[in-house]
From Swiss-Prot:
Protein name: Lethal(2) giant larvae protein homolog SRO7
Membrane-topology descriptor: Peripheral membrane protein
GO molecular function: GTPase activator activity; myosin II binding; small GTPase binding; SNARE binding; syntaxin binding
GO biological process: establishment of cell polarity; exocytosis; Golgi to plasma membrane transport; small GTPase-mediated signal transduction
Origin organism lineage: Eukaryota, Fungi, Dikarya, Ascomycota, Saccharomycotina
Organism: Saccharomyces cerevisiae (strain ATCC 204508 / S288c)
Residue numbers spanned by region Disordered: 16-45, 953-984
Length: 1033
């Protein structure tokens, strides 16, 4: 009568999982990842259980049972500010404002390196596949080893660093200084080169001008013997081999030339300052970017200016006396430009980042698709001018937020060269508030798909607005996780080190809600799960809206795998774990789904409170948390929600309304404003809990909905069975429990066994047997805890010095000296100052008192959760949470570290000059010659073993790039291979994501691309052979 069919349905949902992924071992979900000096926490089951997988602990001295230890971290300790990607090892490094470097690899691979100086990091570069060079805000250079995962050396540069460049295959870092000098640092030998350039702008071009810093440096993408250097007023190419300036580029605007800014002062000569310069991937052209938004294209060999333009205007360097520009309209200033290329480096585009015009305005990115570059040898300057003046297409990508961009990182798919812009499929954007956005390129679609990156980055993509943790029965949890395996993760590098695990009866689910309406559910002890197993639901799709989606409350029914989520507008969506009836292999709506598409309108167009949204399930997910019902009550913001384990959902609103929903209908079985209840002094309900226990002296147990209010009152309702399988709700009592502010948490336990009295389906089924469970309700107020008996006046009180952030009951299984098993029920409290204590109940005897060993933001600590196994998940800050254990283990587990560097992966062959440049006299400089040139004949041997380890990882020719063991790291010379020749593994990833987000991108003429590559290479090789024969090379 009480829904035994429901339990059967839950079991049926997992039958399909038994034969699925049977070859993939799914391990227990309890974490063993630990910080130094920490001990792994223990898992126990409800005290009612007669058996336990718990490691025995003597309970003769309870003080020896409890000990605080951090067992895992999630997210980052502070705001991310810089990023770098290593194509060779396929690793992503993200640095924070407090000097931490997080290096991520495949699935859950992560290594954190903390620098001694806690200053913000401003730049990072991977070098030779084994080094990571880090520069902080104090211009200190750190060299980190991916092999040993340590800081190898610290370098103090003689001056302020204004620009750097490195190359994935070279030992050297070019450093531009504030005084205009360029020095060279030998990363492998840890020494500065004797080679140094003074301020060339002052010595060779503008001796009267003030001292200019170097604003931009770049290695020639085809010739390591040449570098591109920009000062404020001159850009030049410099030959390291010949030790001389090869060509100079000075952008001057004659009178009446409009230029790139919107100034009216066009009647005089101007020289806009340079902010950046870049080589075309073929090294034959360069672009200089100026502070007035001018984009100036030059012939790198002759120094001829080909075209000066802005994003929207051309020939801005030509005098136009009658030109009128609206000076009241301000153009967004260019902050940085990236010269992208596809698989064939002759097909290029510009990605331009703009600053916001005024504070609070949205930033945007602009893509100028230039298409295939005309052949240099047969195209006139006029032809090249037309090429740059008439791009194939232009796209503007507005950011979904008005937060400024602080760092942009293209993720290349083809090679680490061309400044990391070789066929990128994804662009990583770090915003000023620490949020990370990911944009597919060249489509410009923004995606927050959680499985692309490790789970610890989920806190930042986008920012988490709320979080919670819950204990889930392990068999149920592992079965669900097996359906959540995601194979579309972007990073492939590193090796996850196997963690030792302890037997566990319960797993821990961590749930985060985000500003874009997404909710992620993942295993909090992912040290035992090798995959990116996570669930993701998106309220934007379900509610068909794009704004006001920030998630503010989440309730998770762990034993029935149901979810209730509310957003800032007060809309609530109910989800349940099940097979998706709308799943499509093609990931596209079927032709007969026209009616479903018509129903995808906003909830504002609906009159009912409960809206069926099952047809809004994502078509690309076979099994997971599917939307079932949206609650559109128009009652304002929610103040509390609770999705019980017996099918009832309680929703309270800040305006005072209280609603009870039976999910089985669904149906609203109760709705009333508590402000209208006689005797109630409160304005709204602040927490809801469902318990099964005796009320007063009834002599039998009932389903009770217990509500705490903002004025410290407890309102109790009985949920009674009615005819036709329905339920009635009866108000029983209103009790004033505390006078200090709102009630934050309600829990309940049995007087006799101390086991939990929270409502579950097995307890619900036993109601028909007349079982009577005398229980005690635990009420957490502002700074006190009270134990009350519903329907009676008896209570016990415990006060605290500081406000309470989180409380909860835990059930610890212990073993006596005579090997008798005993269950210990305790209450764990966390005060807002980070003080954590453990008490026995109901006598409140203190068993442990410890402080969390690091600062915790008071704004976020209230999102902490006490788990039933003695763990507590604490949200430390906006970007991080930690899992602590309060139970001391007999066996301590040694901390382990993941492997980052994989030996044997070859660094791709660096592109070289083409036949025309060769014939014109360009001297190709080999890496060995460059080492001798910059390091001298007596260059010392490397002081690091990393140098020896990485020595054989360089490809001497393009055919060496192939590595059968690591196909995702290949870099292959373009050949005729058919339609998919330009596809890498990351391209497939990005295209899969585009499909999943219902955004089908054009194929960009793959066949034409492949044919173009083949023909270009054939002509290039033929010309090279002819020249070599004719000139005697």
């Amino acid at each position: 009568m009480f829904g035994s069919k429901r339990l059967k349905n839950v079991k049926e949902a997992f039958k399909s999982l038994k034969g699925q992924n049977s070859e993939t071992p799914i391990e227990n979900s309890k974490a063993s990842f630990k910080s130094k000096n920490s001990k792994t926490s223990t898992i126990s089951k409800d005290a009612k259980s007669s058996s336990s997988l718990k490691i025995p602990i003597s309970s003769n001295n309870k003080n020896k049972i409890f000990s605080l230890a951090e067992t895992n971290k999630y997210g980052m300790s502070s705001k991310p500010i810089a990023a770098a990607f290593d194509f060779t090892q396929n690793l992503l490094a993200i640095a924070t404002v407090t000097g931490e470097v997080h290096i991520y690899g495949q699935q859950q691979v992560e290594v954190v390196i903390k620098l001694e100086d806690r200053s913000a990091i401003k730049e990072m570069r991977f070098v030779k596949g084994i080094y990571l060079v880090v520069i902080n805000a104090k211009d200190t250079v750190y060299v980190l080893s991916l092999y040993s995962q340590k800081v190898l050396t610290t370098v103090f540069v003689p001056g302020k660093i204004t620009s750097i460049d490195t190359d994935a295959s070279l030992d050297w870092m070019l450093i531009g200084l504030q005084n205009g000098s360029m020095i060279v640092y030998d990363i492998d030998r840890d020494q500065l080169s004797s080679f140094k350039l003074d301020n060339l702008q002052k010595s060779s071009f503008f001796p009267a001008a003030r001292l200019s810093p170097i604003v931009s440096i770049q290695w020639n993408p085809r010739d390591i013997g040449t570098v591109l250097i920009s000062y404020e007023y001159v850009t030049l190419t410099y030959s390291l081999v010949e030790n001389e300036i090869k060509q100079s580029f000075i952008y001057e605007l004659p009178p009446f030339a409009p230029g790139g800014d919107f100034s009216e002062k066009t009647n005089e000569k101007r020289t806009p300052k340079v902010i950046q310069s870049l080589y075309h991937p073929n090294s034959l052209h360069i672009i200089t970017i100026h502070e007035d938004n001018s984009l100036v294209f030059w012939d790198a060999n002759s120094g001829h200016m080909i075209m000066a333009r802005t994003v929207f205007e051309t020939e801005i360097n030509v005098p136009q006396p009658d030109y009128i520009r609206d000076s009241s309209t301000n153009a967004a200033k260019i902050s940085k430009v990236y010269w992208m290329c596809e698989n064939n480096p002759e097909y290029t585009s510009l990605l331009i980042s703009h600053k916001s015009i005024s504070r609070g305005d949205n930033q945007s990115l602009t893509m100028i698709d230039l298409g295939y570059t005309p052949r240099y040898s047969i195209t006139s300057y006029e032809g090249m001018k037309n090429y740059y003046a008439n791009p194939k297409q232009m796209k503007i990508f507005p950011l979904p937020t008005n937060v400024p961009i602080v760092n942009i990182l293209p993720i290349p798919r083809q090679s680490p060269y061309f400044a990391g812009c070789h066929n990128p499929g994804l662009i990583l954007l770090i915003l000023g508030n620490g949020e990370i956005e990911t944009m597919l390129y060249p489509s410009g679609i923004f995606t927050d798909k959680a499985s692309l990156f490790p789970q610890n980055l989920s806190w930042l993509r986008p920012l988490a607005t709320t979080s919670m943790a819950a204990s889930v029965p392990n068999k149920l949890w592992l079965g669900a996780l097996s359906a959540a395996q995601n194979k579309d993760y972007l990073l492939k590098g590193g090796v996850r080190t196997k963690r030792q695990k302890l037997p566990a009866e319960y797993g821990t689910a961590f749930i985060t809600g985000h500003s874009n309406g997404s909710v992620r559910i993942y295993d909090a002890s992912h040290g035992d799960i090798q995959d990116n197993a996570s669930f993701e639901v998106n309220l934007s799709r379900t509610l068909n809206k794009a704004k006001e989606l920030a998630v503010d409350k989440i309730s998770f029914a762990a034993e029935t795998l149901e979810l209730a989520v509310s957003i800032e507008t007060g809309d609530v969506v109910l989800f349940k774990y099940e097979v998706n009836q709308f799943y499509s292999v093609e990931n596209r709506p079927e032709s007969g789904d026209l009616e479903m598409n018509f129903r995808r309108f906003s909830l504002n167009n609906t009159n009912g409170v409960l809206v069926d949204v099952r047809d809004r399930a994502p078509t690309g997910v076979r099994q997971g948390f599917m939307p079932s019902t949206a609650v559109h009550a128009n009652k304002g913001k929610t103040s509390a929600i609770n999705n019980s384990n017996i099918g009832f959902v309680g929703i309270a609103y800040a305006a005072g309304s209280l609603m009870l929903i039976d999910r089985r209908g669904p149906a609203i079985i109760y709705m009333e404003n508590i402000r209208e209840i006689s005797g109630a002094q409160s304005a709204c309900v602040t927490c809801i809990e469902f318990v099964i226990m005796e009320y007063g002296d009834d002599g039998y147990s009932s389903i009770l909905m217990v509500c705490g209010t903002d004025m410290g009152e407890v309102i109790t309702y009985k949920i009674l069975p009615a005819s036709g399988g329905k339920f009635d709700v009866q108000l029983m009592d209103i009790t004033n429990v505390t006078s200090k502010g709102p009630i934050h948490k309600i829990d309940a336990f049995s007087k006799e066994t101390k086991s939990s009295c929270l409502a579950t389906i097995p307890k619900m089924q036993n109601l028909s047997k007349g079982l009577c469970i005398p229980g005690i309700v635990l009420i957490t107020g502002f700074d006190d805890i009270r134990l009350i008996t519903l329907g009676k006046s008896k209570s016990t009180h415990k006060g605290f010095k500081y406000p309470l952030a989180a409380t909860g009951l835990s059930y610890i299984s212990t073993v006596e000296k005579n090997n008798d098993r005993k269950n210990l029920t305790v209450i764990i409290t966390l005060e807002i100052n980070g003080h954590l204590r453990v008490f026995t109940i109901p006598d409140f005897k203190e068993q442990m008192s410890e402080h969390i060993p690091f600062p915790i933001a008071a704004k976020y600590i209230t999102e902490s959760s006490v788990l039933r196994n003695g763990d507590i998940a604490i949200r430390v800050s906006e970007f991080q949470a930690s899992l602590f254990s309060t139970v001391k283990e007999q066996d301590t587990l040694a901390p382990v570290s993941d492997t980052l560097y994989i030996n044997g992966i070859r660094i791709p062959y660096r592109p070289q000059v083409n036949s025309l440049q060769w014939a014109r006299g360009t001297v190709y400089c080999t890496p060995a010659q460059l080492n001798e040139l910059l390091g001298g004949v007596n260059r010392p041997a490397s002081k690091y073993k990393e140098s020896i380890i990485a020595e054989g990882s360089f490809s001497e020719r393009s055919s060496d790039d192939n590595n059968a063991n690591h196909p995702e790291h290949q870099y292959t010379k373009p050949t005729r291979k058919g339609r998919n020749s330009s596809y890498g593994v990351l391209r497939n990833v990005s295209r899969a994501v585009e499909t999943r987000w219902d955004a089908v991108e054009d194929r960009f003429n793959d066949y034409a691309t492949a044919m173009g590559e083949t023909m270009n290479e054939a002509v290039e090789q033929t010309g090279k052979d002819v020249m070599k024969g004719a000139l005697g090379f």
